């Protein structure tokens, strides 16, 4: 049985002159306050299976700094590194992979131009291309007969709508149908974030996680809402996810990766310890 992966996620902003800041992180025991490379090293030592950096930088200068961060991280950390955030060209993917990243995550750019997934996958291989899907529950099923209707925890029927630009823009696209298409186009993994759950510490959105895990042949990474190890356990046991992404519970040292993995192992979830 394949082991389940635990993946810390860092939101990285690089607009500050001469430095970089990890958003929402208590800068404890870091040699350089806010340096994502130091945090990546810590997670590597704690037993993370992979890392995700989401670049929330706007400026071109920040993009160049991100390449520097990737290079420094790749020198220090020997687990797979995925980079996401504003990636919209083959050249950008090439630069990021050359700098030492193992995968890139594409989101809004793929929704706007689905062939970008195919082109990227054809050039770099499916194993390098993660399609990130941000979605939100939509209970208007009367006007959406063509959507994939799921039953929520309280029995309410709903479909899941793809949102882009960090959740600011609804698309009218069904998340299940879009995930299927992304797989067909050559995506190697799906990073699924429920915008309803993100930041709530109320647990993953299990209905959509389970649906995608059952429907698709490629791995599903669950994201959005982790507040404790039980939520990660449910993401695997109920949501059937292949990997669990979390941020604040690790950043704020509420739980170590080792503690989470031991919790999972004790409940017969296969993990690498």
UniProtKB/Swiss-Prot annotation:
Paired cysteines (S-S): none
Example GO biological process: L-histidine biosynthetic process
Enzyme class: lyase
Keyword Membrane annotated: no
Claim: Lyase is one of the keywords in the record: yes
InterPro entries, alphabetized: Aldolase_TIM, His_biosynth, HisF, IGPS_HisA/HisF, RibuloseP-bd_barrel
GO cellular component terms attached to this protein's record: cytoplasm
The organism's place on the tree of life at top rank: Archaea
Molecular function as annotated in GO: imidazoleglycerol-phosphate synthase activity; lyase activity
Catalytic residues of the enzyme: 11, 134
Catalytic activity reported: 5-[(5-phospho-1-deoxy-D-ribulos-1-ylimino)methylamino]-1-(5-phospho-beta-D-ribosyl)imidazole-4-carboxamide + L-glutamine = D-erythro-1-(imidazol-4-yl)glycerol 3-phosphate + 5-amino-1-(5-phospho-beta-D-ribosyl)imidazole-4-carboxamide + L-glutamate + H(+)
Location of the protein in the cell: Cytoplasm
Enzyme Commission numbers on file: 4.3.2.10
Keyword tags: Amino-acid biosynthesis, Cytoplasm, Histidine biosynthesis, Lyase
Listed pathway(s): Amino-acid biosynthesis; L-histidine biosynthesis; L-histidine from 5-phospho-alpha-D-ribose 1-diphosphate: step 5/9
Assembly mode: Heterodimer of HisH and HisF.
Function: IGPS catalyzes the conversion of PRFAR and glutamine to IGP, AICAR and glutamate. The HisF subunit catalyzes the cyclization activity that produces IGP and AICAR from PRFAR using the ammonia provided by the HisH subunit.
Family: Belongs to the HisA/HisF family.
HAMAP family in the cross-refs: HisF
Protein name, UniProt field: Imidazole glycerol phosphate synthase subunit HisF
Organism: Methanosarcina barkeri (strain Fusaro / DSM 804)
Gene assigned in the entry: hisF
